[in-house]
């Protein structure tokens, strides 16, 4: 890392040294190698907020196990749209990572992505019926080839022994399993990407840590003047023709300071997260899967419970959660004044509308905050009946600042997902929101590049380069099973992931 530099100009500034900025910086360097890029991070190390391994679940979201991605439609059918969309977006990420591994710009993929089966697990006749219908709908689509289904307790016990340990009674159970799921250490991925960028000659890409962007204003030529304060009380200014705000929850404040009209009306609803974590080898060794179930009735989408295998720094662990909470901080290392400081005349009405229409969410968060350790482990026992309090400890996860935006009908809505807000001239863009986030970082950043650099993006030179980086885009993969299989075969080989298994006979 480098020290301070006075009154400099660069081509591109990225605020925040997480997986989004690392992905965008890598893309832009591949597309425009001569561009001077600086990444500015408030903390003393990179990938220390939302991208840090234990601040997120590490799920390579691909629509394989997330039941809230496949709702039952009004006509009784299962809607696959979101699952297919998420699946093909993750294929774009795997293609990009594979390219970087093949070119030596990423090291051993086993340091950041691991093959972990993705499972869905349900109890009770109604949910078993739902999962069975879901399986029949999904198994016909190439995105979900290899999905297995069972209502046989002995098979579920083979797939995930902890689910059956000590489970009594004859309650109907069902599960699906896809062997090609993944666990991703987004912190390790981010650090690898940034380390390779820093190796570029002549400080073509520079990463500064321990520095905070305090303000940003327009220059007369349309570029941006960025005021930066160091943790050592130094001050400097930096000029850039393009700025990306990828600072997690802090992006909203910076978007507001930019003054671009496109940012008016946006607000944030911060939700904290917690996990139960187990590191005991005798327990961890008996579970190799990410097992997702259904959220309780009335609970928000980010509350879907799951029992996961995690691989962090070469050490396996188990994670269960998430348990939500409420704080007024926008970052795990932020200030309790973050929410209050984000209130503007332009977003007050949407915020009040969301507060009026989401009382059940507020109640849910309050109830979650009040949970004792015993009560959290009780929830875990719906997955792992033999769970003991002393085997699990609480791990505080990162902050998720959900997007609040204007709505012509309701006044304001709460949006669970990510959103890019960009200036009309493409000189500044901010990433707001949360899940599925990091899994689809490549797709989000490709769309951002197209939005902010439309002429260059459409040029023959950039299109050819983009085809090298991500040969098959999501919209193409969704409708071309042969192409999807070919792409997966290559990426899974490069990333050392297991091959897709043939789809079994359907269960009736």
Curated annotation (Swiss-Prot):
Keyword match Flavoprotein: yes
Gene Ontology molecular function terms on file: 2-hydroxyglutarate dehydrogenase activity; L-malate dehydrogenase (quinone) activity
Record-linked SUPFAM superfamilies: FAD/NAD(P)-binding domain
Listed Pfam families: Mqo
Domain of life, source organism: Bacteria
GO biological processes: tricarboxylic acid cycle
EC number: 1.1.5.4
Disulphide linkage map: none
Annotated catalysed reactions: (S)-malate + a quinone = a quinol + oxaloacetate
PANTHER family for this protein: L-2-HYDROXYGLUTARATE DEHYDROGENASE, MITOCHONDRIAL
Name by which UniProt lists this protein: Probable malate:quinone oxidoreductase
Biological source species: Chromohalobacter salexigens (strain ATCC BAA-138 / DSM 3043 / CIP 106854 / NCIMB 13768 / 1H11)
Gene that encodes the chain: mqo
């Amino acid at each position: 890392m480098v020290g301070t530099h006075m009154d400099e100009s660069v081509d591109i500034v990225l605020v925040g040294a997480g997986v989004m900025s690392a992905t965008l910086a890598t893309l832009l360097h591949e597309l425009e190698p001569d561009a001077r890029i600086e990444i500015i991070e408030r903390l003393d190390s990179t990938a220390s907020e939302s991208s840090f391994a234990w601040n997120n679940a590490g799920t390579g979201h691909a629509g394989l196990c997330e039941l809230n991605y496949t709702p039952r439609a009004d006509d009784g059918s299962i809607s696959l749209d979101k699952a297919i969309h998420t699946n093909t977006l993750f294929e774009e990420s795997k293609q990009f990572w594979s390219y970087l591994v093949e070119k030596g710009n990423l090291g051993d993929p086993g340091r950041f992505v691991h093959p972990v089966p993705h499972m869905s697990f349900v109890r009770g006749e109604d949910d078993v019926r739902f999962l069975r219908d879901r399986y029949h709908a999904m198994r016909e689509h190439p995105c979900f080839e290899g999905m297995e289904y069972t209502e046989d307790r002995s098979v579920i016990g083979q797939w995930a022994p902890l689910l059956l340990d000590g489970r009594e009674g004859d309650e109907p159970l069902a599960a699906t399993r896809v062997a090609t799921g993944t666990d991703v250490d987004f912190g390790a991925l981010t650090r690898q990407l940034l380390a390779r960028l820093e190796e570029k000659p002549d400080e073509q890409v520079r990463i500064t840590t321990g520095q905070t962007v305090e303000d940003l204003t327009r220059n007369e030529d349309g570029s941006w003047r960025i005021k930066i304060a160091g943790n050592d009380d130094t001050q400097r200014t930096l000029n850039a023709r393009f700025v990306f705000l990828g600072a997690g929850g802090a992006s909203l404040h910076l978007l507001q300071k930019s003054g671009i009209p496109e940012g008016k009306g946006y607000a944030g609803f911060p939700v904290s997260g917690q996990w139960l974590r187990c590191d005991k080898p005798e327990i961890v060794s008996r579970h190799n899967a990410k097992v997702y179930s259904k959220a309780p009735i009335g609970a928000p989408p980010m509350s879907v419970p799951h029992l996961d295998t995690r691989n962090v720094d070469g050490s396996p662990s188990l994670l269960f959660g998430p348990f939500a909470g409420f704080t007024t901080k926008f970052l795990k290392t932020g200030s309790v004044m973050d929410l209050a400081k984000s209130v503007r005349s332009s977003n007050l009405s949407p915020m009040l509308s969301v507060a009026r229409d989401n009382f059940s969410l507020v109640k849910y968060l309050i109830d979650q905050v009040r949970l004792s350790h015993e009560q959290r482990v009780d929830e875990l026992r719906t997955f792992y009946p033999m769970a003991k309090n002393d085997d699990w400890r609480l791990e505080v996860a990162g902050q998720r600042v959900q997007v609040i935006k204007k709505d012509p009908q309701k006044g304001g809505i709460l949006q669970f997902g990510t959103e890019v807000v960009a200036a009309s001239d493409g000189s500044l863009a901010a990433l707001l929101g949360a899940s599925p986030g990091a899994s689809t970082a490549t797709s989000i950043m490709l769309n951002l590049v197209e939005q902010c650099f439309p002429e260059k993006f459409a040029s023959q030179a950039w299109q050819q380069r983009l085809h090298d980086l991500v040969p098959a885009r999501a919209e193409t993969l969704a409708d071309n099973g042969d192409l999807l299989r070919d792409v997966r075969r290559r990426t899974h080989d490069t990333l050392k992931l297991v091959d897709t298994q043939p789809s079994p006979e359907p269960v009736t």
